[in-house]
Design a protein with these regions (language model features):
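GT-A fold catalytic core of metal-dependent nucleotide-sugar glycosyltransferases
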Residues: 70-100
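Aromatic-acidic/polar surface patches that form glycan- and anion
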Residues: 21-28, 66-74
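Charged, often glycine-rich, active-site loop that binds/positions anionic groups
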Residues: 55-67
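N-terminal anchoring/stem segment of glycosyltransferases
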Residues: 4-58
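Short, solvent-exposed coil/turn linker segments
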Residues: 48, 62, 98-100
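Extended aliphatic helical segments
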Residues: 13, 60, 93-96
């Protein structure tokens, strides 16, 4: 019961990162389709370098320049959750039932 109350306090936003100029692979797009299927009332926020420019944070720029892409994504993920709330999903997560 407490978990349900807690989830209701969290904004219905799903954050995810794609820090590449390459197209998103089909297997990841398939996982993301499951999000839309089971979470139709959620907003989906893609975090890329258009939404969060590398130069917005020296730490992100340094991490990316040193090919520490996961470190850059970690920073952006925490930024997104702190400023907007919601949930973060890696793009290879398949949702199999609604969160509520």
């Amino acid at each position: 019961m407490m978990l349900i109350k807690f989830i209701k306090m969290i904004p219905k936003i799903i954050h995810y990162c794609w820090l590449s100029s390459d197209p998103i692979p089909a297997d990841l797009l398939s996982c993301m389709e499951s999000w839309k299927k089971f979470l139709p009332d959620y907003e989906f926020m893609l975090w890329n370098f258009e939404r969060f420019p590398k130069d917005k944070s020296k730490w992100v720029r340094d991490a990316f320049d040193n090919k520490k892409y996961a470190f850059a994504a970690d920073y952006i993920r925490i930024y997104a959750l702190y400023h907007y709330g919601g949930f973060y999903l890696d793009m290879d997560v398949e949702v199999v039932k609604p969160f509520d």
